[in-house]
Amino acid sequence: MTEEQKYLFDLQGYIVLKDVVPSSAVEACNKSLDRFEDMPPEDFPSPLCLGTPKTEKEIYISNILEADAAFNFLIDIPEVLSVVQGVTCGSYRLNHTYTIYRWAGGYSGLHGHNIPISYKCQYHCRNGEMVSTLTKAVFPLMDCDVEDGCFAGIPGSHKSNFIRPWGGHPDENPVFAPIPANAGDAIIFTCLLYTS
């Protein structure tokens, strides 16, 4: 992890790594995901299951890594692991995998942060090292710009010591910011960051 990456992650609570997944891997993942878009959830191969009820605006499928070997590429990308190791102080594990399909009008309410204190998810820095005990890597499999409903969050909120004064809908939060990324990029963030 570079010094610039450390600074940006600590400042914002996230960083975007550009072009870390080759187009062939993106295509293979998308081809696999296409099978599940219209498949009834009861027909998903085990252990795939819905993470939340399916709606006309969203499908959330848990355990997607087990769906196809195409997703194995996403496990050990050196550039991603360098950042994960840097923000976790070297101790990390793959906890869970999922995919979210989202269409026009779909969104997730803001989630994350540490008030009241969540002992499973902490972020702190000491002696030039940072520890983010719950860190995620998101891999957009299509270009997601601002108008496309890209990943978004409240930069720096992972270090806030006060309760957010606005509601849970992204539109209710004036400091909420889009985090655009393209297919092949990776967004790495601490789960203390308010995201949607």
Regions found by a protein language model. Name each.
Residues 1-12, 18-126:
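Non-heme Fe(II)-dependent double-stranded beta-helix
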Residues 194-195:
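Conserved small/polar residues in nucleotide/adenosyl-binding loops
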